[in-house]
């Protein structure tokens, strides 16, 4: 495939040993003039790293050797250069895993909304990758869990979804969520009870929280891809 072909060329040009860990980077080109990752090769080189980059089929592909450095190092190096959707995946055993890593990096980048400027590792987007692989499962989860919420008037729906996101970010803590939302804790607790009644899922129960997490991820993916309504 394309990823393996590019990785092989990078191996020949860079002289990378077969089993050296690699980071495979994919930055989506939104149009012919976009630059989702600005001068990545220069940035990596200035920081003492080795990389190879090229544009193929609507994306900027990169291979970065991770010999003597780690994922956090690469994130710090590339983040200031990010100007679009960028996905990164680790090929832990070198070139042999590069093709799969490129696929994961591309899919991770594609889970971000168009126009977002962000770098994500595939390993940090596993729920999104699973749901994006099977949109029909995501649609089923969203309908089953959030269906009654989505049927509410726009303002009420938006308020409850914002509250749900805040509660999920804060581990179900109404106090912390209230601080983020600039409202009273009792208001958040009232909305939380509404969410339980509408969804049948309780944030305080492991399975309920899992279903709510998956449902909101599925909803956001559908909106980002144009399949759903915010």
Language-model segments: residues:
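Cytosolic nucleotide-utilizing catalytic cores of signal-transduction proteins
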Residues: 1-230
């Amino acid at each position: 495939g394309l990823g393996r072909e590019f990785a092989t060329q990078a191996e020949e040009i860079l002289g990378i040993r077969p089993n050296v860990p690699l980071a495979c980077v994919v930055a989506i080109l939104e149009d012919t003039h976009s630059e989702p990752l600005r001068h990545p090769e220069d940035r990596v080189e200035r920081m003492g790293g080795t990389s190879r980059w090229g544009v193929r089929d609507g994306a900027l592909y990169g291979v970065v050797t991770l010999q003597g450095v780690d994922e956090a190092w690469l994130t710090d190096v590339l983040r200031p250069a990010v100007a679009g959707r960028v996905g990164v995946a680790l090929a832990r055993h070198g070139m042999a895993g590069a093709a799969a890593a490129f696929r994961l990096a591309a899919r991770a980048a594609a889970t971000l909304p168009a126009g977002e400027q962000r770098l994500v590792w595939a390993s940090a987007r596993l729920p999104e990758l699973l749901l994006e692989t099977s949109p029909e499962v995501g649609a089923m989860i969203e309908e089953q869990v959030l269906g009654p919420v989505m049927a509410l008037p726009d303002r009420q729906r938006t308020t409850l979804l914002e509250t749900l996101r805040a509660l999920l970010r804060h581990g179900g803590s109404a106090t912390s969520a209230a601080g983020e939302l600039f409202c009273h804790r009792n208001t958040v607790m009232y909305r939380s009870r509404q969410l339980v009644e509408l969804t049948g899922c309780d944030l305080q129960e492991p399975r309920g929280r899992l279903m709510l997490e998956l449902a909101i991820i599925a909803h956001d993916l559908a909106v980002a891809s144009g399949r759903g309504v915010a």
